[in-house]
A protein has these predicted regions:
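Conserved nucleotide-sugar donor-binding catalytic segment
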Residues: 77, 134-231
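N-proximal low-complexity "stem/linker" segments adjacent to membrane-targeting elements
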Residues: 1-25
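Short aromatic/hydrophobic "clamp" motif used to bind/position activated sugar donors
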Residues: 84
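Conserved donor NDP-sugar-binding/catalytic core segment of glycosyltransferases
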Residues: 96-130
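C-terminal subregions of glycosyltransferases and related glycan-biosynthesis enzymes
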Residues: 1, 199, 210-344
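Cell-envelope/extracellular polymer assembly enzymes that use nucleotide-activated donors
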Residues: 2-5, 33, 192
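A conserved acidic beta->alpha catalytic loop
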Residues: 23, 38-47, 64, 88
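Glycine-rich, basic loop-to-helix element that forms the pyrophosphate-binding segment
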Residues: 62-79, 89, 100
Length: 344
């Protein structure tokens, strides 16, 4: 029986999926199964997956496209392991990821969700030398609404018992199923799940300092998707309001400002200066105190948005490259410090 079930939704990722599968098969912890969820992928993604000859791989096929939430739900229902790890099929893991999360969860039985920091990579897999640097411990529910410390869907490893605690029954095409992620959400479904875990269970959510997830920056998205993502986030707010109205009343305004700031950074990555400026301005109108609460990140976001909007692209690229090197070096130093503290 596998100790860990790795759940990988697959849809239209033929350029990246082989790297994702290899990163799982190369794990130093070997007692796992890899559940590849074919979400009606129209390209050669599944054919590529079928070229891997490893008995730990199982392919589960959908008859209709259900999105990330639906694919993850299918994976949870089929999983045999007591720990469930999630990997988006355009991302990758470093070889020690599963081993380190297993050790973390064994050492901390009160932790239900273990996540890692993530390193950014380009579409071609080249390291970006910058990292997602979330808070790792003492994470209150409001922090999930404001900043989503888990960061991306390829970072967490979660106990099955956590999903047992948040399971609910939903009607899908006339058939009742166990749901864990909300399939009504095509975006922000992971944030909604983490908030529900934080608010409705006693499990702790903690991170480990190593950047064990490689998070691919895919420029194929359109800036219009940013505003659809904001709409999905608003749906998360309304769902949460239904069972935790006092919590939402306290956190809604600052959380919306942080979400707008996050989307501004996404617009910057998409090289859309106009959208970035619009989003940072909305963030400040919503809650000016984000400048006092997180001055460095907020100032960097505002500066990048206006530079991208106002200066020639070649000059902006030069400034951005230098800034990324400085930020990446500072982040790498902090990671080394945190890893040393953890070992000692």
């Amino acid at each position: 029986m596998p100790e860990i079930s790795v759940i990988m939704p697959v849809h239209n990722v033929e350029r990246f999926v082989a790297d994702a599968v290899r990163s799982v098969l190369e794990q130093t912890f070997e007692n796992f199964e890899l559940l590849i969820i074919d979400d009606c992928s129209p390209d050669a993604s599944i054919a590529i997956c079928e070229t891997f000859d490893d008995p730990r791989i199982r392919i589960v096929r959908h008859t209709v496209n259900r999105g990330l939430a639906g694919a993850r739900n299918t994976g949870v229902r089929h999983a045999k392991g007591e720990l469930l790890a999630f990997l988006d099929s355009d991302d990758c893991w470093l070889p020690g990821k599963l081993e380190q999360h297993m050790a973390h969860l064994q050492a901390r039985p009160e932790v239900g969700v273990s996540f890692s920091r993530s390193a950014f990579i380009g579409e071609d897999g080249t390291p970006n030398h910058c990292y997602q640097m979330p808070r790792l411990t003492d994470i209150e529910p409001g922090y999930f609404l404001c900043r989503n410390p888990i960061g991306n869907g390829s970072a967490p490893v979660i106990r099955r018992a956590v999903f047992d605690d948040i399971r609910y029954i939903a009607d899908f095409l006339g058939s009742f199923e166990d749901w864990y992620f909300d399939e009504h959400l095509r975006r922000s479904e992971d944030i909604e799940c983490w908030i529900r875990i934080a608010l409705t269970t006693d499990w702790l959510i903690e991170g480990i300092p190593e950047p064990l997830t490689l998070y691919r920056l895919n420029a194929g998205g359109l800036s219009a998707q940013l505003f659809k993502q904001l709409e999905s986030w608003e749906q998360v707010i309304e769902k949460t309001r239904g069972y935790a109205p006092d919590f939402v009343a306290k956190w809604e305004r600052p959380a919306r400002a942080y979400q707008l700031r996050y989307l501004a950074r996404q617009a910057i990555r998409l090289q859309d200066g106009s959208a970035a400026v619009q989003l940072v301005n909305r963030a400040f109108r919503t809650e000016p105190r984000i400048l006092l609460q997180e001055p460095t990140r907020t100032i960097l976001t505002v500066g990048a948005a206006y530079l991208l909007h106002l200066v020639p692209q070649s000059l902006y690229a030069t400034i951005e490259n230098r800034a990324q090197r400085l930020i990446g070096n500072a982040q790498a130093w902090r990671i080394e410090r945190d890893m040393g503290s953890r070992i000692s």
